[in-house]
């Protein structure tokens, strides 16, 4: 459970890994309103500062809920996450809700 804050400056693209809480704080601290991106099924935020353009696709309870529904749709037997401990508590509530139905 993690995401990246992407920075594009000219032709240079860099990123930093952040946990779910840090990503939400980043959006809040920079006055970025997240919007649902139908293509990626994730909340998304962006802003520009000087010559840099910043983008964040959020892995959060909303996106996890969609991923779990895809598991149902395609009868996928399980899911893996990159690293435990980077998630928000709400994610476990979404997973528990999914598990109680299946």
Where do the model's predicted regions map?
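Conserved residues at the C-terminal ends of beta-strands
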Residues: 82
């Amino acid at each position: 459970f993690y995401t990246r804050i992407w920075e594009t400056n000219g032709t240079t693209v860099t990123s930093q890994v952040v946990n779910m809480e840090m990503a939400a704080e980043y959006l809040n601290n920079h006055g970025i309103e997240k919007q649902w991106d139908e293509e990626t099924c994730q909340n998304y935020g962006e802003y520009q500062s000087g010559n840099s353009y910043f983008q964040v696709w959020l892995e959060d309870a909303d996106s996890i809920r969609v991923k779990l529904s895809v598991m149902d749709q395609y009868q996928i037997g399980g899911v893996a996450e990159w690293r435990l401990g980077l998630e928000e508590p709400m994610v476990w509530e979404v997973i528990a809700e999914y598990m109680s139905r299946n």
